[in-house]
Design a protein with these regions (language model features):
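Short, compositionally biased P/S/T/A/G/V-rich stretches that sit at domain boundaries
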Residues: 2-36
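Extracellular Ig-like/FN3 beta-sandwich strand-entry sites
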Residues: 40, 100-106
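Extended low-complexity, serine/threonine- and proline-enriched intrinsically disordered segments
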Residues: 58-74
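Solvent-exposed serine/threonine-rich low-complexity stretches and specific carbohydrate-binding patches
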Residues: 73-83
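Aromatic sugar-binding surface patches on proteins
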Residues: 84-93
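Short acidic/polar inter-strand loop motif in beta-rich domains
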Residues: 110-120
Length: 128
């Protein structure tokens, strides 16, 4: 099983020292904290706030996944050069339709050189 890098696994001191490395690899979930049952919810997953990720033939973000707890929801794949062979922030908009139960969303992303990275979880409460 591959090692999964998560923000909680890394000490505050190491995060500060290697801020660019962690920033460009760790997915961030951006969505409303509340959603309506049966209505589309936009969930944006973005890699990095400040530091762009390379988009080279041998070093790029291969895919981004969205999970609700242990349930796989969606996935987007990228080929090398998807960002024009320039460093940038991979962004994906997923649209999901929530059921009646609250969600605990997590995003995963794979860098071809630095492995599997997991976001912090995002709780979404459901309104009827």
């Amino acid at each position: 099983m591959p090692r999964v890098f998560t923000p909680v696994d890394i000490s505050k001191e190491e995060k500060e020292i290697r801020k660019d490395y962690f920033d460009r690899h760790t997915p961030i979930i951006i969505c409303d904290a509340h959603a309506r049952e049966g209505e589309k919810l936009k969930v944006k997953v973005k890699l990095g706030k400040e530091y762009p990720h390379p988009d080279d033939p041998d070093h790029y973000i291969n895919y981004v996944q969205l999970w609700n707890r242990e349930t796989f929801l969606a996935e987007a794949h990228f080929a090398p050069g998807a960002l024009g062979n320039q460093s940038g922030h991979v962004e994906v908009d997923f649209y999901i339709v929530p059921g009646p139960v609250s969600m605990n969303l997590t995003a995963m992303a794979v860098c071809t050189n630095h492995g599997l990275w997991q976001s912090e979880s995002k709780e979404v409460t459901i309104q009827k």
